[in-house]
């Protein structure tokens, strides 16, 4: 993958992984009308962009995925041209305070955000199909998002080529 093409590819892969994991789907516990199957979770409770909880009408939990390619001048630099970049994957697990207890899964004593972060960590950490090398959990912190919403933010890091060694059909040059 080259340059920014990793962003959409990683987001799509993670969204697919989340909706196809029965433990994660059960932990989200989506009660929104019109959600018939796991595909319906996309852009209702699993987003590939950041989401403001106040734009949602239901007491629920949702997950957002963002991918960033931060500047890092010292990483494997070759004079002025960097060979590698270190994309970060930021996953926000946001729950309304009334949805924090995991009442729908017996024997789970963690709150919903902590439990989901454990499941996501197990699913992603150490995998080698995101860029080059293994994806690594760098941070997993808890915070609140204004009144009524609690958040757990997970940050993973991977490595990728800054420029492709060859052009594939998904990486067409923009003129």
Where are these regions (language model features)?
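C-terminal tail/extension regions appended to the core domain(s) of diverse proteins
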Residues: 2-4, 151, 159-175
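Acidic-leaning, charged glycine-interspersed low-complexity segments
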Residues: 26, 30, 110-164
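Residue-level recognition of well-ordered beta-strand positions that form the cores
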Residues: 66, 88-94, 155-159
